[in-house]
């Protein structure tokens, strides 16, 4: 069957959902850098020109996938923290525990971390102003939800929770990128063990970064 254009808003949304689902599935198989519009089109059985009827670019597809994945991850973080039952613990203990939970949950979503690491440098570069506005508005709503989770864990942060949340997301992408590069450099560490000082392990590095941001913000 040849391409049939969606005739209603519902059909158009269904086609968009199909494209986003295919992109999300591909991210489980390959890094963001390897995901091309050509391969995405092949996976959904459409010509590239037809995919571009629903999204203006590969980058817009991935921004949409990023936000959906982030939303689900924040819900997972909230549930994981609630299961810790540490509301009455001392502040230092809660900081370390929350950082550990965040690092564990985030590390379970490498596709999301890859998207976050590419957001500013790649994904926001080939989209229209309208697409950026939609993404930023959705990101603002997501940050508000994340801030609520952070506040439940560390109420002492008060109005600084959104700032901490934003820094946590930025650090997540950066630490992931370093951890991936470190993994690829493992052979160099074997040649010269002294270079292993540059090895970055995702979970402990992310936990340390998040705990430092929270503690540092409270100390300012």
Annotated model-derived regions:
Residues 123-154, 162, 204:
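Amphipathic alpha-helical packing segments from all-alpha helical-bundle domains
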Residues 14, 18-25, 43, 60-83, ...:
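Alpha-helical structural segments
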Residues 106-130, 183-188:
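Amphipathic alpha-helical segments used for helix-helix packing
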Residues 64, 79-112, 164-168:
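Hydrophobic alpha-helical connector segments
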Residues 144-152, 156, 174-220:
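C-terminal peripheral helix-coil segments that are non-catalytic and often amphipathic
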Residues 73, 92-114, 196-220:
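N-terminal hydrophobic signal/anchor transmembrane helix of membrane proteins
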Residues 1-31, 38-42, 85-87:
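Basic, helix-initiating cap at the start of DNA-binding domains
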Residues 33-60, 64:
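Helix-turn-helix
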